[in-house]
Regions:
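N-terminal glycine-/serine-/threonine-rich beta1-alpha1-beta2 phosphate-ribose binding loop
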Residues: 3-113
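A secondary-structure boundary/capping signal
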Residues: 15, 120-121
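Short, hinge-like loop/turn segments at secondary-structure boundaries
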Residues: 62-65, 136-138, 164-166
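Rossmann-fold NAD(P)-binding glycine/threonine-rich loop
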Residues: 98-113, 121-162
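Conserved anion/nucleotide-ligand pocket segment
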Residues: 161-174
């Protein structure tokens, strides 16, 4: 942030359902205001479902997102991590908006490879204490954060979304 250079945050979003799609749309709509008001450049660099991904190290455009079915390629989590490393991406946040028990197994390799975690998936916190303990130890070892929020109403994580919108300059009313 020296000399007014914005901080780039690279987002990898896992899940394209109702919650994931809404989150992606909100990010596209709010990121110009977030850049202007907070000097944070949010870039979605990957959008994935359980089997396929669209990746662009420079950032995915709304048009790329709309063309997901045309641009998607099969992937494994290790390949996606390798792509991120190949392009030397920093300030990585993996966002899990799946409801998948299987996807939670990717949390440890993501953290070990430089990702902070944000999740609307409740499973990691309820899968069992041994996994939760290992996740917390790995987060501490790699100095990473794990933020999570359960869903309400129409299935959208509310508190952090409201905070983000407020910080981007939106007026919140009852």
């Amino acid at each position: 942030e020296i000399f007014q250079i914005s901080k780039r945050i690279n987002l990898v979003i896992f899940g394209r359902g109702t919650v994931g799609g809404t989150l992606i749309e909100q990010i596209f709509q709010a990121r110009a205001d977030i850049l202007k008001r907070r000097n944070i450049n949010l870039q979605i660099v990957a959008i994935a479902n359980s089997k396929e991904v669209v990746f662009n190290h420079k950032g995915i455009s709304p048009a790329d997102y709309t063309a997901f079915d045309t641009l998607k390629v099969p992937y494994q989590i290790s390949e996606l991590i390798a792509q991120v490393q190949q392009h030397h991406l920093e300030n990585l946040i993996a966002i899990d908006v799946t409801a998948s028990k299987a996807f939670v197994e990717n949390y440890l390799p993501l953290v070990e490879n430089g990702f902070d975690l944000v999740s609307a998936n409740k499973i990691a916190n309820t899968i069992g204490y041994p996994f939760y303990k290992k996740l917390r130890e790995t987060l501490t070892q790699y100095k990473k954060q794990y933020l999570y929020e359960t869903n309400v109403g129409a299935g959208l994580p509310l508190i952090d979304t409201i905070k983000l919108l407020h910080h981007s300059g939106e007026n919140i009313t009852r």
